[in-house]
Amino acid sequence: MTSSDPAGRRPKIKAASVMRSAADQLAELLGRPPESVSALTRTEDGWEADVEVLEVERIPDTTSVLASYRVTLDEEGDLVEYRRTRRYTRGQIDRPN
């Protein structure tokens, strides 16, 4: 049981708050601002988010290098793990396998 909820249920965190939290915490660790959060999934233990980050800025912008990071957050929205899953140029289009 928690002191904030006498029934012992965990407080609900809104998806928008989790998205901001994932982006902010990853930016603090990497020293680079996120471009976007491209995916957010509720898990048994918390949340998983995919965050897109500009890694190398180039001109023209379509040649800039971005990376996709998978971020794992606990039930309170605190970052517990992150890993880079992909690097790509901004102009690259995803193609079906």
What are the residue ranges of the model-derived segments?
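Short, non-transmembrane alpha-helical segments in secretory-pathway proteins
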Residues: G8-L40
